[in-house]
Amino acid sequence: MWLEWLVAWSWSLDGLRDCIATGIQSVRDCDGTAVITVACLLILFVWYCYHVGREQPRPHVSVNSLLQGVDANGLQNGSMYCQSPECARCTHHEGLNQKLYHNLQEYAKRYSWSGMGRIHKGIREQGRYLSSQPSIQKPEVFFLPDLPTTPYFSRDAQKHDVELLERNFQAILCEFETLYKAFSNCSLPQGWKVNSTPSGEWFTFDFVSQGVCVPRNCRKCPRTYRLLGSLRTCIGNNVFGNACISVLSPGTVITEHYGPTNIRIRCHLGLKTPNGCELVVGGEPQCWAEGRCLLFDDSFLHTAFHEGSAEDGPRVVFMVDLWHPNVAAAERQALDFIFAPGR
């Protein structure tokens, strides 16, 4: 009798319920064979529920999507907190952690787990790290544990690259001035982007945006582009890497915000630094200087403003993201793989 039930079973949840009900009725009639049937069906029912639960679709969260929704609101480079409920940078943290762990496992299979302890720990406990961080430092996407934290870094943190940038100050400035002449012909020349600010104007000219080179812009500034290739610690192969010229017009205030990660140092080389301009990181103010690099951790709450007059002209810096000096070479390689553009 129980074999006939299995043959006729429609392999659905409703079929299971009907069979179990029939089996229970048989038990009441003291049918010994039905007891075995009910037991088998209960086991199959448990298996069915487990199987259905495993196959529930999970939202796919690519690493790149973390920084995409911001652009739709007129922002770029993860520069400001996004209020959009659809922005993957601000939601779906569980799906993100699963994706990051999958990327780490794939990297370890290809190469090695050696030196991956801190990254593994960071991914495994990402939610706790981000929620427990003090409000003065709160990276929005990825926090690597056990890195020394400070709002500003000394020039010696990445001495080679700082000195190389400062030696090439005049070359970068010259290429910027050529670019900036185009502003007299139209409101926004090709290659420039406008960033959202509560007051004033903030423009950027990207060479590398979220780990992706912008060829058209690089061709307009060949010496600056070659210089980027000479930097030893430039982040160029993952979504946390950016390089651009950043221009603040007089009267501009950038809203306080956090960067996406603590694995990088943001470097500003001053090109034009009139009076009344200031950078505030973690509550500590600093001023730019022409021809000098200013290094800071943008995972700290930070802002910038230009309180000068129109006669002072814009504040201009060359911005590039460098590796945090305490991220080991093996970790850099793995993070480039995990956070590769398009992954």
Swiss-Prot record:
<dbReference type="InterPro" id="IPR007803">
    <property type="entry name" value="Asp/Arg/Pro-Hydrxlase"/>
</dbReference>
<keyword id="KW-0408">Iron</keyword>
<dbReference type="InterPro" id="IPR051821">
    <property type="entry name" value="Asp/Asn_beta-hydroxylase"/>
</dbReference>
<dbReference type="GO" id="GO:0016020">
    <property type="term" value="C:membrane"/>
</dbReference>
<keyword id="KW-0325">Glycoprotein</keyword>
<dbReference type="GO" id="GO:0051213">
    <property type="term" value="F:dioxygenase activity"/>
</dbReference>
<keyword id="KW-0223">Dioxygenase</keyword>
<feature type="binding site">
    <location>
        <position position="202"/>
    </location>
    <ligand>
        <name>2-oxoglutarate</name>
    </ligand>
</feature>
<comment type="function">
    <text>May function as 2-oxoglutarate-dependent dioxygenase.</text>
</comment>
<keyword id="KW-0479">Metal-binding</keyword>
<feature type="binding site">
    <location>
        <position position="246"/>
    </location>
    <ligand>
        <name>2-oxoglutarate</name>
    </ligand>
</feature>
<feature type="glycosylation site" description="N-linked (GlcNAc...) asparagine">
    <location>
        <position position="77"/>
    </location>
</feature>
<protein>
    <recommendedName>
        <fullName>Aspartate beta-hydroxylase domain-containing protein 2</fullName>
        <ecNumber>1.14.11.-</ecNumber>
    </recommendedName>
</protein>
<feature type="binding site">
    <location>
        <position position="257"/>
    </location>
    <ligand>
        <name>Fe cation</name>
    </ligand>
</feature>
<feature type="binding site">
    <location>
        <begin position="266"/>
        <end position="268"/>
    </location>
    <ligand>
        <name>2-oxoglutarate</name>
    </ligand>
</feature>
<keyword id="KW-0560">Oxidoreductase</keyword>
<feature type="binding site">
    <location>
        <position position="302"/>
    </location>
    <ligand>
        <name>Fe cation</name>
    </ligand>
</feature>
<feature type="transmembrane region" description="Helical">
    <location>
        <begin position="32"/>
        <end position="52"/>
    </location>
</feature>
<keyword id="KW-0812">Transmembrane</keyword>
<dbReference type="Pfam" id="PF05118">
    <property type="entry name" value="Asp_Arg_Hydrox"/>
</dbReference>
<feature type="topological domain" description="Lumenal">
    <location>
        <begin position="53"/>
        <end position="343"/>
    </location>
</feature>
<feature type="topological domain" description="Cytoplasmic">
    <location>
        <begin position="1"/>
        <end position="31"/>
    </location>
</feature>
<keyword id="KW-1133">Transmembrane helix</keyword>
<keyword id="KW-0735">Signal-anchor</keyword>
<dbReference type="InterPro" id="IPR027443">
    <property type="entry name" value="IPNS-like_sf"/>
</dbReference>
<dbReference type="GO" id="GO:0046872">
    <property type="term" value="F:metal ion binding"/>
</dbReference>
<keyword id="KW-0472">Membrane</keyword>
<comment type="similarity">
    <text>Belongs to the aspartyl/asparaginyl beta-hydroxylase family.</text>
</comment>
<feature type="glycosylation site" description="N-linked (GlcNAc...) asparagine">
    <location>
        <position position="185"/>
    </location>
</feature>
<feature type="binding site">
    <location>
        <position position="315"/>
    </location>
    <ligand>
        <name>2-oxoglutarate</name>
    </ligand>
</feature>
